[in-house]
């Protein structure tokens, strides 16, 4: 094993007596205090361990590699509580997501390991989980459990939802130029129904984007994932923001807490993306029906107070009228998308 790999597998957080989610300032302060103790005690071996640990944890790239090595210890077949890990399916700003199965029932679940969440925000995460605990809707995964992982961080257990994301669908060759407007319409119709349920239950999604929309084309169904995490900020230093540029609302980018209207902004940007438009420069394809263009314009206004809100308008009903005006029907009889 190389010196670098050895450094990546040592428990440097334990050496510096800090939590794995500690800030750079806390790590620096702990290092200075412990090095002084080692120096005063003339403990050369401890001094070397402290320096090795600080060398890794004070460097963003090395710390990231160290954390990834620890996360990689959660392999296929590992048992955590009542669940057996099957595979890693995603990695994002909050941590790693795994597909797992319940050991007794064999039911599939999704475990969201919040490894990049601070100790302070873990309490916020717990509060958010409580608010989502009893939510039941065909368009959102159900909250099943909360776990403590081997590294003492928190993980949310949710029902597993199969299917590609909207982003993955749009990566297919036949959809490189965007989806047919009527396909986008049924996706938006389903998404508005889900958002209405979440918002009326006091939950803001906070990261509306194609990557968080699972498409089940045979049933013309959409499932929103990663909901209810809008108040939790990731601790990673590698660009993770807790929201997604180009899809995030101006208020989120300025650091404010997202609102229901923030979800509408993200939905509007997602519509542009799905239609084959330019999300960055907000250009909608020319073939898009005028009524859908106007709907998008209302959703993506810079001022959240200028966007629609549920108190003034039922967006579900409004969009069904738009579907009727654009396509002559409110329910699509189109063939399923090819996935």
Task: Set out the residue ranges of the language-model regions.
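AlphaC helix of the eukaryotic protein kinase fold
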Residues: 118-134
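Short beta-strand micro-motifs within the conserved protein kinase catalytic domain, predominantly
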Residues: 142-154
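Catalytic-loop of the protein kinase fold
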Residues: 199-215
